[in-house]
Amino acid sequence: MADSFSLNDALAGSGNPNPQGYPGAWGNQPGAGGYPGAAYPGAYPGQAPPGAYPGQAPPGAYPGQAPPSAYPGPTAPGAYPGPTAPGAYPGQPAPGAFPGQPGAPGAYPQCSGGYPAAGPYGVPAGPLTVPYDLPLPGGVMPRMLITIMGTVKPNANRIVLDFRRGNDVAFHFNPRFNENNRRVIVCNTKQDNNWGKEERQSAFPFESGKPFKIQVLVEADHFKVAVNDAHLLQYNHRMKNLREISQLGISGDITLTSANHAMI
């Protein structure tokens, strides 16, 4: 069920010759638009920081808005975790941060940069109670990114994500740690209390006792799933009215740290 895309195809059509840099990337990645020894514009009263361009935002900055977050793989400028956007330098604070202070509200630990509370990489609020239901007001839509972070319990048996429409399940994502002594990921859809044909994935990036990050990107005709920053699989929509998918159920043998959604 894994598609044949490279990560560079995970989000097509960026048109960005250097689709790198992710402000607020997880791990120890730097934020966008930083400068050596200086904070973002505004840190030096009455002057721009070294290398700034008078009267405009420096390369890699997004004037007047928060930069986009991203599913792993190139997309809009500054989207992919890794090297920073043009003009950025390692180890510098993100927009709104000052030397010696943490990033803006919503920054994930050890990450520079931050997003509003609605962003996918907010400060973990957990552990959250499992099973956990994440409301999806207005349903899902293309370019919505759902991010789930937590830790697999020791001797885990399963993880379950269910994108629900009432009693139906539009997308069932079910890593199984021991199905007949094998590890497998099962995806399916349930309509009118009937499960459809299973799609099985042998690649299995989860480990008992280890932390994980699952990202689900909604596209017009499929879901894309990435685990720990690597594209894993895609699942074609069997329910076409995405706006009716109003809840994500999270269950299984995990400690849940955070669950968020945002548009990218």
From Swiss-Prot:
Region listing for Disordered, in residue ranges? 1-105
Which coarse location class describes where this protein primarily resides?
cytoplasm
Query: What positions does the domain Galectin occupy?
Result: 132-262
Gene Ontology biological-process annotations: cell differentiation; extracellular matrix organization; innate immune response; mRNA processing; negative regulation of endocytosis; negative regulation of immunological synapse formation; negative regulation of T cell activation via T cell receptor contact with antigen bound to MHC molecule on antigen presenting cell; negative regulation of T cell receptor signaling pathway
Q: Motif Nuclear export signal residues?
A: 240-255
Q: Where is this region: 9 X 9 AA tandem repeats of Y-P-G-X(3)-P-[GS]-A?
A: 35-114
Task: Identify the Pfam families for this entry.
Answer: Gal-bind_lectin
Question: Can you tell me which residues the record assigns to a coiled coil?
Answer: none
Phosphoserine: residues bearing it: S6, S202
Assembly, per entry: Probably forms homo- or heterodimers. Interacts with DMBT1. Interacts with CD6 and ALCAM. Forms a complex with the ITGA3, ITGB1 and CSPG4. Interacts with LGALS3BP, LYPD3, ZFTRAF1 and UACA. Interacts with TRIM16; this interaction mediates autophagy of damage endomembranes. Interacts with and inhibits by binding NCR3/NKp30.
* Functional description taken from the UniProt entry: Galactose-specific lectin which binds IgE. May mediate with the alpha-3, beta-1 integrin the stimulation by CSPG4 of endothelial cells migration. Together with DMBT1, required for terminal differentiation of columnar epithelial cells during early embryogenesis. In the nucleus: acts as a pre-mRNA splicing factor. Involved in acute inflammatory responses including neutrophil activation and adhesion, chemoattraction of monocytes macrophages, opsonization of apoptotic neutrophils, and activation of mast cells.
What is this protein identified as?
Answer: Galectin-3
Q: Which organism is it from?
A: Mus musculus (Mouse)
The major lineage groups are:
Eukaryota, Metazoa, Chordata, Craniata, Vertebrata
